[in-house]
Amino acid sequence: MAGTKEIRTKIKSVQNTRKITKAMEMVAASKMRKAQERMRAARPYAEKIRNVAAHMALANPEYKHPFMVARDIKRAGLIVVTTDKGLCGGLNTNVLRAVTTQLRDLQNKGVETQTTAIGTKGMQFLGRVGAKVVSNVVHLGDTPHLEKLIGAIKVQLDAFNAGQIDAVYLAYTRFINTMKQEPVVEQLLPLTADKLAQSDAEKQAYSWDYIYEPDAQTVVDELLIRYVEALVYQAVAENMASEQSARMVAMKAASDNAKNVIGELQLVYNKTRQAAITKELSEIVSGAAAV
């Protein structure tokens, strides 16, 4: 059994670790609230631009944007959204597992793939598995800006426009609530009328004709690019909210575990100290009896 000095050292070490995890838990809780506010603030814009895009798509303009033309999938792009930092439980592991499944399914169908990494963890993973990475953006910080994302996203959008790829998928962690986050892989392109108008009522409501200024092609070109960018930004915002929630939960679990370990070590320390005192008393009594 370890001596009292060694046990005290262990207790001190665990106490110091608990202080760190407790501080990280509090920081993550603060960042989580801000991330959730950003996520909620982005939703009205994404929803409004989806509504307008649905109007454009379902009004049957004479011009049909390439983003809305379905074709046989021989090559595909995959945008992978992960975190820059760790210590967030199984968040990255879960979404990267979904990415692995998606890549395997596409390869089994003979589909070539190219990827875009948003986040350091995704960049490192795609490099390890030998995936073709055509663009990336890392170190977004705690406040994502669309300006930082546009360059990496545009590589995939331009490839789709040029016919170099036939579909684009988006992988990220969807925020459900503080305790639950869900990894998802969604098809980003091509867009469909069913995706834009999510109900029959919407389809009927958006079925009238429009007069375009300056013309349908210019309006639809600009609108659909902004819509896709909004979808990716929303995914990044949800991923960041999920990251901070997962980190807060992970740090709370670490703090609770440290508290339990300290209690167990304290019990061992007390027993060891009691045994040492008992032994000393026994030696004193034995010495006195011998005299």
Curated annotation (Swiss-Prot):
Family under the similarity heading: Belongs to the ATPase gamma chain family.
Pfam families from the UniProt entry: ATP-synt
Record-linked InterPro entries: ATP_synth_F1_ATPase_gsu (IPR035968), ATP_synth_F1_gsu (IPR000131), ATP_synth_F1_gsu_CS (IPR023632)
Keywords: ATP synthesis, Cell inner membrane, Cell membrane, CF(1), Hydrogen ion transport, Ion transport, Membrane, Transport
Membrane topology: Peripheral membrane protein
Organism domain of life: Bacteria
HAMAP family, per database record: ATP_synth_gamma_bact
Protein name per UniProt: ATP synthase gamma chain
Function as written in the Swiss-Prot or TrEMBL entry: Produces ATP from ADP in the presence of a proton gradient across the membrane. The gamma chain is believed to be important in regulating ATPase activity and the flow of protons through the CF(0) complex.
Primary localization: membrane
Assembly with partners or alone: F-type ATPases have 2 components, CF(1) - the catalytic core - and CF(0) - the membrane proton channel. CF(1) has five subunits: alpha(3), beta(3), gamma(1), delta(1), epsilon(1). CF(0) has three main subunits: a, b and c.
A GO cellular-component term linked to this record: proton-transporting ATP synthase complex
Compartment list: Cell inner membrane
Biological process terms in GO annotation: proton motive force-driven plasma membrane ATP synthesis
GO molecular function: ATP binding; proton-transporting ATP synthase activity, rotational mechanism
Range of residues in the leader sequence: none
